[in-house]
């Protein structure tokens, strides 16, 4: 049964889920494997641009700590800036750490060019999936569910990641923090995903791993939020239902089938 043939509401009058909106890093992408080498290199370069007389006052480890990354172990705080925000936000946080009169990160053209070069060198073609993503995403798409991506990364970077992983054709739209709809937890990007697919928020589920994802879902008033976390104890907000916590997308089709309000359940019946 195709989605276009499936009634907008089930027999009990409950809205049928038609759209799944995904966060990217930590959900589709392995955040640590893909982006940790990049942010380490950018932190090192940032320190290299400080005046010689400030040497020793601030190190790359300090910059990383300010965004929730432990330089020694590589541990990433799931509630930290690195896990949930863009490089623009990271640079704003770092700017406040720098000595007075130091480089202006956001406006220095040479700095921005070098950062972009580091991203291209270290990340392009080196996207690492968070487990098997092709099978579950392909199954959901084949069943008729519409898939969209909402990330606080920039749109071009997100498109590149999806292309690297071979799943770009499954997602429409792909919305980044620079796409003109704000950044999460602002709900406008999520609302745009709904509008672009012609579905109501009551027919939409958000899948994410951070407080920003959850707050965007809550603000948009979508039907539900599914959390990617290794354990329910690690979910970003206790209001998230423990039964909605899964360690990876590999378990997402099974979880959706169990809900009884998606096209997957209809196909199984």
Language model feature labels by segment:
Residues 129, 147-149:
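Short, low-complexity, disordered segments immediately C-terminal to signal peptides
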Residues 15-134:
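N-terminal helical cap/lid subdomain that shapes the substrate entry/recognition surface
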Residues 103, 140, 145:
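Short phosphate-binding/catalytic loops that engage adenosine nucleotides
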Residues 27, 151-153:
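Conserved phosphate-coupling serine/threonine residues in phosphotransfer and NTP-handling enzymes
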Residues 81, 123-124, 145, 177, ...:
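Short, contiguous strand/loop micro-motifs
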Residues 28, 147, 206-207:
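Conserved SAM-binding loop
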Residues 123-127, 152, 181-182:
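Short, flexible loop segments at the rims of nucleotide/cofactor-binding pockets, characterized by
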């Amino acid at each position: 049964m195709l989605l276009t043939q499936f009634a907008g509401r089930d027999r009990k009058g409950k809205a049928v889920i038609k759209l799944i909106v995904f966060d990217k890093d930590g959900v589709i992408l392995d955040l640590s494997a893909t982006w940790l080498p990049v942010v380490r290199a950018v932190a090192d370069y940032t320190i290299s641009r400080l005046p010689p007389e400030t040497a020793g006052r601030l190190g790359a480890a300090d910059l990383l700590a300010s965004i929730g990354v432990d330089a020694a172990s590589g541990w990433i705080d799931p509630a930290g800036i690195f896990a949930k925000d863009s490089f623009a936000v990271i640079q704003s946080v770092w700017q406040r750490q720098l000595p007075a009169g130091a480089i202006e990160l956001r406006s220095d053209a040479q700095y921005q060019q070098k950062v972009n070069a580091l991203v291209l060198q270290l990340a392009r073609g080196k996207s690492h999936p968070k487990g098997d993503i092709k099978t579950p995403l392909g199954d959901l798409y084949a069943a008729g569910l519409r898939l969209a991506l909402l990330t606080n990364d920039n749109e071009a970077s997100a498109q590149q990641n999806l292309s690297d992983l071979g799943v770009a054709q499954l997602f429409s739209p792909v919305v980044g923090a620079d796409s003109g709809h704000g950044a999460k937890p602002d709900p406008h990007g999520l609302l745009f995903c709904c509008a672009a697919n012609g579905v109501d928020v009551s027919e939409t589920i958000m899948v994410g791993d951070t407080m920003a994802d959850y707050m965007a879902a809550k603000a948009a008033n979508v039907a539900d939020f599914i959390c990617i976390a290794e354990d329910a104890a690690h979910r970003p907000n206790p209001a998230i239902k423990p039964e909605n916590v899964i360690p990876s997308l590999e378990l997402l089709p099974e979880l959706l089938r169990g809900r009884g309000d998606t096209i997957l359940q209809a196909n199984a019946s």
